Design a protein with these regions (language model features):
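Flexible loop/hinge segments that line or gate small-molecule binding clefts
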Residues: 137-182, 198-202, 275, 301-313
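Flexible loop/turn connectors
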Residues: 257-371
């Protein structure tokens, strides 16, 4: 009789979890946890069966989650990062997030750690994440360029430092050839004729690193000092391992020790980036060299630490935070244009932004010491 009255009461109205709770003699929270299989609390078999039986008898169905995919898309940007141990990438993220927050967007950061496997996994996740845009803070791996070009037909992509890559997507660019030349010209103007250049692995995957070195070598070559540059790059295995928090610093430190042991006539050492330059400085300090009196040192990126008085690192400014903001602005423009029609057709545009690299001369470079 009780069961009949229960059924009658449900006629003409939607059954709720509260109805199931009353029928089963349990709390509404218990109904929710049991039916959603969230056993945060240990329920007896008898309670589980009672709840399930009541739900079935009353014809109760769990409410389908209304996924407003478009509203989700309007709030999410995905950012690919090769590592988070270098302040350069943190600065880029800061610029991206500052602009995204202004526009009401959140970020999903994919730290690939320069792993092809991780990069592929994250790319395949894009369909489920359903972002409104994707930003790469470095060049994508070459083996995924076709995939990215295909994805960019439906999701706006912006790539930072994409110059010279054959990829038709929006980009915030850096001319690494020019940057390398600026570094070399500064040292040549100070009379340095024998210098060392320390870099992470110079592989096909990391083409932009090689471009920076190439520009440096060209400037020395045109000055008649083609043999005046010693290139020291880390083993390729460095990029295949998960980067340690001090991996780039260690590259600078360890390879400087090798330079000092093998090339006693060097008067300046250049790091491909500031993190490597910090390692160079510490290695010189440990070997009792005075900077810049005995050895000049340069870095690149003008990160926060390079400005500290005790370091005062000569470096290259290429406006990292601004580049992050610009990449985000490009995505916002693409989103806006996708929501607008120009007559009967959809406009297609490719944005390219480039900043001129500039030298910031501080206390680690000076005139070459006569040896």
């Amino acid at each position: 009789m009780a069961e009949q009255s229960c059924e009658v009461e449900q006629l003409g109205k939607k059954v709720t979890s509260s109805d199931v709770a009353k029928h089963a003699g349990v709390s509404q929270a218990t109904v929710s946890m049991v039916l959603n299989k969230k056993y945060n609390v240990s329920f007896s078999r008898e309670v589980i069966e009672r709840v399930e039986h009541s739900a079935e008898e009353l014809g109760y169905e769990l409410p389908k989650r209304k996924r407003k995919r478009e509203s989700r898309r309007e709030k999410l940007l995905v950012v690919f990062c090769p590592n988070l141990t270098n302040p350069y990438y943190v600065m880029l993220l800061q610029g991206i997030e500052a602009r995204a927050t202004e526009q009401g967007y959140g970020l999903f950061v994919c730290n690939t750690q320069r792993s092809l496997v991780l990069e592929e996994q994250y790319l395949k996740m894009l369909s489920s994440l359903n972002p409104r845009g994707v930003i790469y803070t470095c060049n994508p791996s070459r083996c995924y360029l076709e995939m990215i070009e295909e994805l960019s037909k439906t999701i706006p992509f912006a790539i930072i430092n994409n110059q010279n890559e054959k990829l038709e997507v929006d980009a915030v660019e850096l001319d690494n050839l020019k940057l390398g030349r600026i570094m070399a010209r500064h040292l040549l103007d100070l009379g340095h004729k024998k210098v060392a250049y320390i870099a992470p692995p110079l592989t096909v995957r990391q083409k932009q690193r090689s471009k920076r070195v190439e520009g440096f070598l060209k400037e020395f070559s045109e000055a008649g000092l083609a043999n005046g540059v010693v290139i020291k790059s880390a083993n390729e295995s460095i990029d295949q391992d998960v980067p340690g928090i001090d991996s780039e610093y260690r590259i600078g430190y360890d390879l400087t020790k090798e330079v000092l042991a093998d090339h006693g006539d060097v008067t300046a050492i250049v790091g491909l980036n500031d993190m490597i330059a910090f390692g160079i400085l510490d290695a010189l300090y440990d070997e009792k060299y005075k900077v810049p009196n005995d050895m000049s040192v340069m870095g690149c990126d003008n990160t926060l630490f390079s400005k500290m008085r005790k370091l005062s690192l000569t470096t290259i400014e290429h406006f990292v935070i601004y580049k992050g903001r610009d990449a985000c602005d490009i995505i916002m423009k693409k989103i806006k244009s996708a929501d607008q029609k120009y007559g009967e057709i959809q406009p297609i545009s490719i944005y390219h932004v480039e900043y001129e690299p500039q030298i910031v001369v501080r206390g680690t470079t000076s005139y070459a010491k006569t040896k």
